[in-house]
């Protein structure tokens, strides 16, 4: 849900159960409790049934371009191309991939934030179309560099 609608970080779900069980569930501290704003965002995203289909072609094309730009030293994990995030890993385990991409102005999340990945990996969002050229140039530069 969150990634497919471009709302990464928003966790939304629901439970269908009995009133008795709801009484117990409501007593549990839930780290994923949604604020009113989050509920409104989730409802708005779910009400637009065309969003995913209308943008999936864009995401597919951009992820294909990213994959083609990776060069010999970068690999892109296999994920559904309709999802606007990807995982990149550099062959050199000593390389801080986030730092290298930041030198080119690309914001991403270091693999060290996700077990068991290391600093030679990053997770990044597919950018808006107008920013894609900058990302591709950075990927090519880092993918070719030893």
Residue ranges and their predicted role:
Residues 2, 112-115:
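Short, acidic/turn-prone active-site loops that include or flank metal/cofactor-
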Residues 107:
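Residue-level detector of anion-binding/catalytic polar loops
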Residues 1-72, 76-78:
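PLP-dependent aminotransferase class I/II
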Residues 25, 97-100, 135-138:
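Hydrophobic side chains in well-ordered alpha-helices
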Residues 60, 73-104, 122, 126-128:
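Conserved PLP-binding catalytic core of the aspartate aminotransferase-like
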